[in-house]
Amino acid sequence: MSQSVSPGIPEASSPGILHGWWPNPIFRRYVRSRLRPQALVVWLLLTLVVASFLFFMPRTLALYQGRMPIADAERMPIFFIMGLQAVILFIFGTGNVAAGVTAEADEGTLDYQRLSPLTPLRKVMGYLLGLPIREWLMFAVTLPFTAWALWRGEIVASTWMPVYAVLISSAVLYHLTGLVAGTVVKNRRWAFLVSIIVIILLYTVIPQAAKFGLVYFKYLTLWPVLDEHMLEFLPRTIRGPAHLASLLTDKPDARFFGLNLPEAVFTIFSQAVLSLTFIMILWRRWRKAEAHMLGKVWALGLFAWMQLLLLGNALPLIGSGDLFPARQIARRYGAQMMAEPQIGEALAMIGLYGLVTMVLLIVLILIITPAVDDQVRGLRRARKLGWKRVPWISDAASSLGFTAAMALLGGIGWTVFAQQIIGSDWFRGHQLAAWTGPVFVMVLLGAGLCCQTVLEARGGRTLFLVCIFLGVVPVLTGGVLGMVSKASLTPAAWLMGISPVSAPFYAAATMVPTTGFDDTFSLTIPTAFRFWQGITVLSAVWLVVLLRQQHRARRESVLGPVDLFTKCASGTSAPVPPSGLKDRG
Amino acid sequence: MRIRCAPGGSFLTVMTPATPAAVPAIQINDLRVDYGGFVAVDDVSLSVPPGEIFGLVGPNGAGKTSTFRVLATLMEPTYGEVKLAGIDIFEQPENARRVIGYMPDLAPVPSDLKVWEFLDLFAESHGLGTGPERMARIGECLTQVSLLEKSGVFCKTLSRGQTQRLVLAKTLLHRPRVLILDEPASGMDPLSRRQLRLALRNLAADGATIIVSSHILSELAEMCTSLCVMNRGKLLASGTVDEVRKALGRAERTLTLGVLERAEEAAAMLGRRDHVTGISLAGERLVFQFAGTHREQAQLVTALVQEGFLIHTLEEQKSTFEEILVEVAESGNTIPSLPPLPKP
């Protein structure tokens, strides 16, 4: 680095290639701080050593112990190296993104970035690509090993390109997840932990739901594409067993309603939509630090889109039976046992769809519901501007209407899913009750409104306690009670029925009359479901009435006992807003 | 300079006759900031013309930092309008940020960057030309705050005062037209403070408007061309130090008079004069409060001499600005004496 007359200041600030290729100040800031030679050399050497080991060990074993042909032996290290790349990008990269942005918030230097005239999008991109720059270089160090294995292993580009495209898009998605976690969580250590937990949940645990009909979730991971191309990566000499070959070759394309898409294309598309949502969250936060993560309309749109994706991926697989776990198991083990989908698994899948929809609904309610302070601020602003009420899409407005709209959409999606499954050829002897739609909507509406009203009126802490004591404790206690004896199954079913978590499964069991199950299942669960849903609906109505009373009281406490807005509307005493006052709600 | 203040509406304007037609550098209308039930800034209106060094004074919790954070586009108020150099900061935040230089209280610096790297990050964000041009500007700013020799060291190795100076250099980088400095002198040694004062005066002379808060009030009084006192979210008074003192009803000072003979008679005579209160007698020394002008004070002394009193000393003692602020903070926040001012 050349020195100018000023000690320590270089004559120009573009000492490296990475500094120059993208003129984003935040990116360049991290290129400087995270690529300092001392630390970088250590990390790159470490990566080189591990990658070398993972490359040479399986290759040598295959070549000298397995006596494989050279082209086959060269293929052996590919998955090991890919695993290392995944660890570097997914775990180290994401953790550093989350911790890095929280560190800035912790130090207080994030405010400087808020003050800079860069657009929110440039800031987001700067952090997204700058914070994990060292991990991307470490990834680059492993690429020669991959390139060698692909070249000498004679793996064609159409095999490895989709896999690496999805690997990179997954990494970007995970980094965005880390960035969101780091931006939302205030504590540096928690940000790291939360980002890792969110990633494990989003991209490891939740995708397991794909095995039970929620196929969309698997497209958030690398697995579908890897599954699709697994066989071409494996050495030809170990593709032996016929059922393994059929398992690996007989893969359907990604189905979205009537469309057949390559797995890679649909995966990248699915991840892009989620990435866009994360970018929207970050954009809102950079634009206004106090803003909700998502606006109300965006949340409603996202919810509808998720329903569309869940249905679009699942419905085309019903006819062939590929949606059902029994068929998947049969395929995996090459056996014919349990090849026919069972009504029990259909009920479980319908219940799970309802539960996932309910969880998504509650997550979005948590995002869009204003805190009491926000509501008061919104009222004050409205009063100042002489408005009749807070604009309905502003962050400060009640989320009651949007909760109801999302519950309605979720109920419709859930009903369509259940109708398509039960109405399929696999379950000819079964029929969905006529009032399934309204009941499903009621289940989601009851849980959603209770959650929303408690959150809006009493805050997150009260909601947390309610969730623990009404959502979790009854399920756990009922589970333990059910283990005692057969006689205790009935009280256990009643107890578990208190929890909204069990409601979707109880609803599925109630709406699809079945035979062949014992009395607990066929009699107790529907009765318990009707009773507890009745209680839930009454509670929801009562809470909504209370919330509206609280809204009125709050409006009067903020605006005074006289309703200025009514007067304003009638023209008797219109408060004139000072010129130039703007709303930014 | 004229000062106007409406006690109820918390409206203040500082008007400099030299620039009557200029667009105010800082224009705040009906600004309110709430934190839950706590009103941090209560319907404040304020107008500061270009070239002023405007001090914002008040005890902790007065609402200074909240006001500064709103001005710096870091916080959204409950409502209100803010224009900096004619730019609405809520409508055009990116444009507003080009004219703002903000230095927060206890200004932090990143631990993983060197001094020049820290400055280059913001020089580039503000689009200050090519690499060499930016480096030249960084050199200028570091020279201005006497940190040039530290440009190659990591920010985390700087002392508190050096960190403050570095952040000041960062604030000055893009030649902002409105400087918002929250406690800029905290942690600085006396020499650095003097440099800061000089730097701010030079900037103001070049047309920049500076709004600054400090707990070192005497220093603020020296530095600022005008002051404004804030307490419990409301603006109380504005003007020069003396004008503010007067506006706050603290224009009176303590006079001590040394009289050789007939001290009791002199006390009786003082008791009959206007503007005189709280007379106490200790031997030959008469101590009393006087709220009149200096001319009236001279007339008082002349009258005493004409009555034949032998005066050998006259000492004047003004209450310090700190004392006034302590009183303001403890006593409440209304100023009954000033006439209401119509809002623009």
Question: Which residue ranges define each predicted feature?
Answer:
Chain B
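ABC transporter nucleotide-binding domains
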Residues: V23-I26, V33-V212, L217-N231, L236-A237
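ABC transporter nucleotide-binding domain
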Residues: R197-A291
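C-terminal coupling/interaction segments
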Residues: F11, T16, G292-P344
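Extreme N-terminus of proteins, especially the signal/transit-peptide cleavage junction
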Residues: T16-P24
